[in-house]
Amino acid sequence: MVEGHIRRRCATSDQQSATIELERGGSFTIALRPDKAAKTVANFVAKATSGFYEGKTFHRVEDWVVQGGDPEGTGRGGGKMPSELNDLPFTKGAAGIARGPDIKVNNEAQWFVCKADASWLNNQYTNLGQVTSGQDVVNGIRIGDKIKKITVG
């Protein structure tokens, strides 16, 4: 019984991560949470592994957030998919999916990373993971910085 519990726990603790490399140098890694946002993570991974995000810019940079992934680079591009609101908090380093005015509909391309705690986003946006390394790189992102590559492992 204990052995089975340990085996199940280990199997569920295998997490995917995404390492985002910037064209100007530097990278950061996000531990993805498919256990909390399965379809959102699957969509992000599919886009990342297809090369969709390569060359896309960070079009929004504020003191608390950086946002990128927009195919138009304006903050208006990207399709729609259902939200997967969850109980993961939007603390410093949290990664989430952008959305418009309808809380039930996510943007399927644009994503963001918090540079500071943003508790007002809790239960309002889909959280898909947490930065585990390179938060200093996230904090240094400027408008127009481009994604070189995203590696999922």
Annotate each PLM feature:
Residues 1-153:
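Cyclophilin-like peptidyl-prolyl cis-trans isomerases
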